[in-house]
Amino acid sequence: MPDVTFKVDGQTLTAPAGTLLLEACKSHGIEIPAFCYYPGLSLQAACRMCVVRIEKMPKLQTACTTPVAEGMVVVTDSPEIAQARKATLQLLLGNHPLDCPVCDAGGECELQDMTFKYGAAESFYAEPKNHREEQKWSPVVYFDRPRCILCYRCVRMCGEGMDIFALGVQNRGSSSVIAPNIPAQLSGVIENGVELAQLDCEQCGMCIDTCPVGALTSGTYRYKTRPWEMNHVATVCTHCGDGCKTTLGVRSVTDGSQILRGDNRDKSGMNGDFLCNKGRYAFDFANNIERLTSPLLRKNGKLVPVSWEEALTFAGTRLRDLREERGSNSIGVIGSNRTTNEENYLLQKFARAVLGTNNIDHHRTADFVTLATSLQGTTGTFASQRDVATSPAILIVGGDPTNQAPLTAWNIRTNVRLNKARLYIANHEEIKLRRQAKAFAPVAQFGYGAFVKSLAEDNDFSKSLHAEPKLIVLIGNELRGGELASLIKALPNASFALLADYANSRGASDMGLLPDVLPGYQSLQGSTIASEYGAADAPGLDLLAMFDAAAAGKLSALYVVGSNPIKRYGIDPAALKSTFLIVQDLFLTETAALADVVFPAANLYEKSGSVTNSYGDLQLVSKAADKAGTRSDFELIVRLADHMGHDIRTLVPFGKGLRADMGQTRGASSGEADRHAVWLTANNMEPRLSPFDPFAILDEIQRLVPGYDKLLRLQLLSGNDQHLVPASTGLVQITAARKDLVLPSADNLFTSGSLTRYSPMLQDVQRHQSTETAGHLASAD
């Protein structure tokens, strides 16, 4: 839209026609206070804090509902306006409890900030304040009614943003109160003899984060600490494949540091302010008492704690001996889709350059190999997460973004609501997003191949898709191999993305945790990286074939990093009875319990590096916390290679640069590291890196991995995401005979079956949801 020119407090400003006055002023650094206004939600005009004086208007106007107009003259700060805002605050504070010293919102409360600014420090009410008992609506949502200022942000966020409508308003006028969708008499939840109202929703906590005061508080955070007592670290969520940025609130404890809160209130990252229940609450797996904190070695049939040196020496010596006695091809390596790109790259390099084997794989939750192969040489492209939020048309084939990729579902809903995007769905079951769909094509459970063929037929669904000038196609893990390739061929000029299940599923494939391709999906024969590694040119065993070989007594050793194949694939533990097994993980999983050596590993919140989400968006992972007794997977791989007698300088190109101590000891706390980094950058130099620093291998990734050669190092280290696409040719794909290599995790909003089973809060939420479901069924009877 064309720009209009207007004046605010004597300044001449411009903004696109139709822009709300409040947003236009904000973009020019002019603050107008507001409680009820929230970007992306419908306009409420309930709080009257944003009132301004507009020339030729008879009374004060709300800036949150007034669009800018040509020639408009506005005053945002005057004695009249200040008095109006002060009067509004006095009304709000009239019955607001003086809980600031104990309220979780203290220090972050918008009401607190505005009270200090506009001077409503004394109440002109003599009557005692009304008191109401705090209500527990779910394990993660608590409501304190007297604190509520009736801005209705929570109601609109739940209905418009999340499409849940679990919150509403009871009564009218001054008697209005926010209430959950399950009243006390129907909830079936009784505490201390009193029936409690309950929330039947996705437990995302978005209502809590949008609340400007402390009326809604989090069950994981309440009464534990203050905002100024925590370090706030921006990193990437460790759960699904969407790649949400999360800001973790961390406090020091005796055995390292403890994560106390997860949110993204600064709205940075591709997810804005959105986080699902896993991103917001399921960080507590890191503090689980079952975390491994000491290496374990099997002695007399039992795993017992030992020193790091004993465990590493035994594992390294045994692995080296087995390689020499039975050959490199008798050893297998299984990686993880929850470890960083740098760790995944290093692990496959360890397998190929140290062990000398291509027997390497990971739990694949989507067929990225076929996606990369099928898009080569076509007019199709790789979609980014941001494309989903802006594209005029979206097709979902299989999958359920609401459960599997909540940010994707959020972006689709927002795009449909705000931009009128057209949503098409082809699925074998009803999914929540059908409510936003323009068209729905029912598919038989195993009939996606037939659906792909129908796209070439003369039917309304197919004609609508082919008529879309710009189409984003999101593909569930029901499609793989030939069916996936056929879908891509059937929709030329579209952009495609796969819905994978874990934080770095795409990165694990991109970095070469595969038996038949190298990093960047390069061929085992003739590529630059193949000659540099000196790796074998014959494809290795995939994950399932490794266990077949183990059962046949042909796999002498198996090194498992951050994976639990015994549980995930339902493998008979007896298959490993004659295989030397090394496992590094956070917990004593079903696979780790069978191991000869177990190394306690750090999780994604306890390390630095990068991850690539399902769309190919590369993001920085920052170390937020520590756990005593654990080490990063990167360090463990390097130390294991060292204890095998391998020259680790050929594994990790560390040590280049000027000094090794800058930024690692005193510089980290004095600010000297930052100054030194700036000086080195200005002189086109880099600091010397430790062999355990994941960024020591970033240059090699840039040099050797097609697609990642386009990454901008400074942009990555600054925390900005970058959309990368594979750039290799001559790729391979999973054949029809190996479809079982892609195994969906049967993910849902409340569990992924791996990390979340160690999250007490998510387990509590899951029990709550089960109780709600049972209660509804009983009510229906």
Where are these regions (language model features)?
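Feature of Fe-S/electron-transfer and energy-metabolism proteins
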Residues: M1-D3, Q11, P16, V102-E122, ...
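Fe-S ferredoxin-like electron-transfer domains
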Residues: R48-T238, D242-C244
